[in-house]
Every structure is written in structure tokens, then in C-alpha cells.
Amino acid sequence: MTQDPRFPNLFILNHPLIQHKLTHMRDKDTSTRTFRELLREITLLMGYEITRNLPLTTRHIETPMGPMDAPVIAGRKLAVVPVLRAGVGMSDGLLELIPSARVGHIGVYRDEQHRPVEYLVRLPDLEERTFILCDPMVATGHSAVHAVDVMKQRGVPDEHILFLALVAAPEGVEVFQQAHPGVKLYVASLDSHLNEHAYIIPGLGDAGDRLFGTKN
């Protein structure tokens, strides 16, 4: 895991398997089926990385050889909240890693001016729960900011929110960290820049279209 000195709460997950799979996802010749499988696999690996500092407590159990106080994750069950629609493709990998997690959804799309438009919010009980928000791309950053706004407006503190993305542009990370400096953002890659159409360069194209086999 590395950091960029410009962005104190951005964490780049540079594990070799993550980077290898991301390269195949970027390839324009990768099929929809393979893209979908890779997204699940890479999200599982990223989920392993971002949960390494979850707090632990102990629970008394009996092993076949006798009693012990064994480590378990402290607090209430985690929640996975994909940002629709492309974030749905990331939830499978996280739920494979954390099958007991609760699931919410935040529906946001970008209008012609690249502003976020909310159309759905469905969340589990919020109290004392850690939330992993996921969206493959942080381009302009506005959708990510809006998704975190949704959580914080409902009383979820910064330290209980983790935002997970595959690829981000510096412009979007700047917007995100100005809006939510206390929320940690985890990505597989910090790419070069946004083009005139607000697409990440080099990026991987439209993640939703590639995931679902649709045309923009």
C-alpha cells in the first residue's frame, strides 16, 4: 500500500495481483464476462487489504483441545454499499470475503454537466456500523462525494466510512478530499488526468457499460 503526498487520505493498493488483474481490466479487448470476473476478483483482494485494521475483540470458545479466548471482529457487522450501477459489480467480491455483511445501495448518475443526480437510497441500520462504499471510478469525484454525503447526513461518522474504487483521477481525488478530508479513499490506481469528456486517462473506459455489456 502506497500514498501520494498530495492526498493524505488516499491509499493506493499496489499488491502485484491487484495490479495484474487491473491491467487485464483496462485492455479494450477484454470480454464482458472476463471483465465481470476480474472485477469480482480484484475487489476481493482489495477488500482484504482495506479490512486489515478492523478492531478485534475476543470471544470464549471451545476447541477440540480445550477452551480459549479467540480473536473476532469487534462491533456490529460491516455493511457494503455499492454506488449504482457499476458499484454492484464490486459487491460480489466484498460479500465473498465478508459473507455476513449487510448490503445497502445508493443510486447516483451523472447529468450532462457531470453533476450527481440521486435516484435511490436503501441502507441497513446505521448505528455503530462500518460502511464500505464502492464504485469502480472516481473521475470528477462528485458522485463519490455525494455518496459520502448521504451517509454523513444520516449520522455516520468519517471513521466508519471507507470508500473503495479501482481507478481515480487526481482531479476527482482533490474534490473528494476537500469535501471529506476525514474519509479514507482506497484505489488500485491513481491515473493521469481527466479528458475533456471527464473520462479518466488512461482509465478503463465506462465501467458500467463494460460490466453489463451496454452501450453509452
Curated annotation (Swiss-Prot):
EC id: 2.4.2.9
Cofactor: Mg(2+)
EC class: transferase
CDD domains noted in UniProt: PRTases_typeI (cd06223)
Gene Ontology terms describing biological process: UMP salvage; uracil salvage
Keywords of the record: Allosteric enzyme, Glycosyltransferase, GTP-binding, Magnesium, Nucleotide-binding, Transferase
Record Pfam families: UPRTase (PF14681)
Activation and inhibition: Allosterically activated by GTP.
Pathway of action: Pyrimidine metabolism; UMP biosynthesis via salvage pathway; UMP from uracil: step 1/1
Superkingdom, taxonomy of origin: Bacteria
Residues involved in uracil binding: 200, 205-207
Record's cofactor remark: Binds 1 Mg(2+) ion per subunit. The magnesium is bound as Mg-PRPP.
Chemical reaction(s) catalysed: UMP + diphosphate = 5-phospho-alpha-D-ribose 1-diphosphate + uracil
Gene3D superfamilies (UniProt xref): 3.40.50.2020
Molecular functions per Gene Ontology: GTP binding; magnesium ion binding; uracil phosphoribosyltransferase activity
Binding site residues for 5-phospho-alpha-D-ribose 1-diphosphate: 85, 110, 135-143, 206
UniProt xrefs under NCBIfam families: PRK00129.1, upp
Known role: Catalyzes the conversion of uracil and 5-phospho-alpha-D-ribose 1-diphosphate (PRPP) to UMP and diphosphate.
Family: Belongs to the UPRTase family.
PANTHER family in the record: ADENINE PHOSPHORIBOSYLTRANSFERASE (PTHR32315), URACIL PHOSPHORIBOSYLTRANSFERASE, CHLOROPLASTIC (PTHR32315:SF4)
HAMAP family, sorted: Upp_B (MF_01218_B)
Protein name in UniProt: Uracil phosphoribosyltransferase
Gene source species: Ralstonia nicotianae (strain ATCC BAA-1114 / GMI1000) (Ralstonia solanacearum)
Gene that this sequence comes from: upp
